[in-house]
């Protein structure tokens, strides 16, 4: 299911329609059932590549983050130390994707969105995808 968020005064709310549930399969590891991903797409080309932009915003804080997986795209586990929210951020296909985890709340997602908008000075379209 895909929902395009209305650009209301002050921007999107980042309300989370589906929370993923963490499961621990017998064979080991962790899996998630259900998902919500916010897909952010700049409406004009930013001055720097999206991966560099995301890394700069994360480095400037208030974030602790790591890109700990060897994947063909950047995937960061992010903690906003201001809001306490933890979520994943990926960069793929000209978009920045915010992946909700079980305890993620809207303020952390909104804060990263606001920092991307402030850093680029361009509008961003926001799409909410649920599974």
Predicted regions and their residues:
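Acidic, polar-rich N-terminal leader regions of halophilic archaeal proteins
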Residues: 1-131
């Amino acid at each position: 299911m895909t929902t395009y968020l209305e650009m209301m005064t002050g921007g999107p709310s980042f309300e989370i329609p589906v929370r993923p549930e963490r499961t621990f399969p017998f064979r080991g590891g962790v899996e998630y059932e259900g998902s919500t991903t916010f897909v952010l797409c700049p409406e004009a080309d930013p001055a720097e590549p999206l991966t560099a932009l995301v890394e700069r915003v994360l480095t400037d804080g208030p974030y602790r983050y790591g890109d700990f997986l060897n994947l063909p795209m950047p995937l960061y586990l992010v903690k906003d130390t201001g809001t306490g929210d933890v979520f994943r951020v990926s960069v793929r296909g000209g978009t920045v994707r915010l992946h909700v985890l079980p305890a993620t709340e809207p303020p952390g997602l909104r804060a990263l969105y606001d920092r991307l908008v402030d850093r680029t000075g361009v509008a961003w379209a926001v799409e909410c995808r649920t599974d």
